[in-house]
Each structure stands twice: as C-alpha cells, then as structure tokens.
C-alpha cells in the first residue's frame, strides 16, 4: 500500500504525537535535533487531512473500556469517516470491536 493510493486522515492529535515521538528519539540520541526538525517538515509535507476531535469526544469516552483516549481518537475518527484504520499497533488492531476495517502495517 502506498500513500498516494489512499486518502489519509488523522486526528489533529497526531501532530503532537509525532513531535512527542521525535522528542523521545532525540533525547535517546537516536537522531539529532536537526534530523528531527527535518522529519517534522517531511511529516508536514505528507498529503494528510487533519481533523479536529471536538465532535468525537462523546464517542472517545464511549470507547474507554478498550482504549486510551489517544487510541480511541483514531478509532472514533475512522468510524466517523467510515474509513479503514491503518495501524502498526497490533494490540490496537486486536482491541477494535466495531465494524471498523483494520489494516495493519508490517
């Protein structure tokens, strides 16, 4: 699957999660601060539609038995858009009990 074969949608929360992940890699000295800055720009250049989450809050709370609020945000957005949820998180993929299609990355 290639990014140009599908429309990519993420909750706006994804932006902060990307930065948090890059911050961790810089603190572990796995990448330089300069490279992390380049990675942020690469991420921002991706053709991704970002969605606010305020209209998802009730559903996010409803998913609380199975997901953190962060994971539930992605599940709720996929449900709202009637779109597949693309994830590399096997645990998340196994936990989804809705009619949402799950596609896992290797």
Where does each model-flagged region fall?
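Acidic, PIN/NYN-like endoribonuclease modules and their adjacent C-terminal/linker elements
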Residues: 11, 63, 75-106
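Acidic catalytic patch
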Residues: 12, 35-65
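PIN/NYN-family metal-dependent endoribonuclease catalytic core
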Residues: 1-28, 52-53
């Amino acid at each position: 699957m290639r990014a140009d074969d599908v429309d990519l949608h993420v909750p706006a929360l994804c932006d902060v999660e990307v930065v948090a992940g890059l911050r961790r890699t810089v603190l572990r000295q796995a990448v330089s601060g300069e490279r992390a800055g380049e990675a942020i720009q690469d991420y921002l250049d991706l053709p991704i539609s970002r969605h606010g989450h305020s209209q998802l809050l009730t559903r996010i709370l409803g998913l609380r038995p199975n997901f953190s609020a962060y994971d539930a945000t992605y599940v709720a957005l996929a449900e709202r858009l009637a779109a597949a949820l693309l994830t590399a998180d096997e645990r998340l993929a196994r936990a989804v009990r809705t009619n949402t299609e799950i596609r896992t990355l290797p």
